[in-house]
Each structure stands twice: as C-alpha cells, then as structure tokens.
C-alpha cells in the first residue's frame, strides 16, 4: 500500500465567501470527495514555468516546415493549462508542511492509500486520470525542445510543464495525480486510511472530525514534539466512536 498525505488547515480561516475552510475540508471528507484545481489554483506562482526559447526560434527559422509541429505544441500547452492537479506529500511529519498548510500545526493531514485513490478516480469516467509522478526539483526551469514534440512524448512534456518545481520546494516530497478535468470528484471512502491531527489542534476540533467520520475504521494520530529535538512523531490516539455503525456508502468493487 502506497501512502501519501494531504495537509489541511485548522479553524479560523475563511474563504472568499466568508465560510470556514476547515468545515469545508471536513465536509469533502464526509461526502467522499476531493477537489482538483488547475495549476493556477496552486500556491506557487511559478507553476508551469518552463523555457521554450530554442523551440520558438526553431519555429521562426523553419516556419515553412514547422507549422504542424508548432500547432501540436500549442495544442499540448493549452491542454496542460487546464488539467486537474491533486498535490500530495510523501511525508506526514515535516514541520514546515504542518506550519504552512495546516495553520501552524492546528490543522490536520489526510492519509490516502494511493492505489485505492487512483482506482476510484479512474472508475469515475469524468475524471480521466492522465498520469501520476513525483515532482522533480531543479535549480533552473525545465526546457522544452523539438525532440519532445516530434516524439509525441506527452508524459515527458507534462512532467516539464506541471511536474517540475524550484529546488526550494524539495522538502515537500510532492507526488501529483494529474487528471483531464477539474472540480469536485467522488472517491471510494476506503482511499482515506488515517487522519493526523496537528500538535496544536484543539480537542474540540479533534472530536468534531472523529464524530463526522465515525464508523469508517480510520486510524487517528496526533503529532507530538520529540523531547529535546526539532522532530515530530505521530502517536496513535483512540477513536472516540469505536462502536458507531459501520459506514458503507459508495464502497466500490473494481473487479
């Protein structure tokens, strides 16, 4: 089972409509959903930055012969700008991720079984998964050249367009699922296997999440600071609703 993690914020942060982002994120869990934004919905303004000067020069110099290649290139880039991106981390104990994405350790992290998550999203014919890959971290932006276009190397081009980030982000250990469409999608609830609570998450919010997700057989952990160190570790905490009726909604068989 391959695991990956999605960090979510704590209470107190509102969206543009004045609604609680914390309650929104819990509601998507309750409803067995996730949201896929385009690259422009991600937090790094340099998402999708790449170099194509050499390619553009080729188009200019060989304009008489390169029309079809340029047309194909523009078609690729238009498509990639609109794909759905689900960003996850391979790490549940990175203090920077807890600080940035989980409201200073007051939020939570969702543990996914990536295999089940991929299966359930592929089962959704509208989602249409394209690829999954680890983000590559570089000091310089990736380059697009004529060999990639001529070879119709969609995977390699997609990685350079939406799978490469500055080396400053390497601590995130990011893995991305890329889909043809964007928006809210239903998933198999079994794809969520555990919830990790930030070390500063109030007990009331922990109870709120457990009550909302009762009956799903989830494991729960709370992050704690290891004495006399900068490290954090996850300690399992008891489910407060162990005898709740078993949750069975939208359980999918992929056989």
Task: Give the location of each predicted region.
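Partner-binding and oligomerization surfaces adjacent to conserved cores of proteins
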Residues: 1-255
């Amino acid at each position: 089972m391959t695991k990956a993690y999605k960090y979510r914020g704590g209470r107190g942060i509102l969206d543009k409509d004045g609604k609680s982002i914390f309650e929104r994120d819990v509601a998507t869990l309750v409803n067995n959903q996730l949201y896929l934004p385009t690259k422009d919905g991600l937090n790094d303004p340099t998402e999708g930055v790449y170099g194509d000067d050499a390619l553009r020069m080729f188009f200019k110099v060989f304009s008489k012969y390169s029309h079809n290649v340029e047309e194909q290139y523009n078609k690729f880039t238009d498509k990639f700008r609109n794909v759905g991106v689900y960003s996850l981390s391979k790490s549940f104990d990175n203090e920077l991720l807890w600080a940035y994405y989980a409201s200073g350790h007051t939020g939570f992290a969702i543990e996914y079984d990536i295999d089940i998550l991929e299966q359930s999203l592929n089962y959704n014919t509208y989602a249409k998964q394209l690829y999954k890959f680890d983000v590559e971290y570089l000091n310089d932006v990736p380059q697009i050249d004529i060999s990639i276009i001529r070879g119709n190397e969609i995977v390699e081009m997609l990685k350079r367009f939406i799978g490469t980030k500055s080396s400053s982000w390497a601590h995130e250990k990011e893995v991305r699922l890329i889909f043809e469409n964007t928006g809210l999608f239903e998933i198999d609830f079994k794809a969520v296997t555990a919830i990790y609570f930030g070390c500063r998450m109030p007990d009331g919010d922990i109870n709120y999440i457990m009550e909302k997700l009762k009956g799903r057989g989830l494991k729960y952990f709370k992050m704690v600071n290891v004495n006399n160190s900068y490290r954090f570790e996850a300690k399992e905490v008891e489910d407060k609703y162990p005898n709740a009726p078993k949750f069975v909604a939208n359980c999918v068989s992929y056989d």
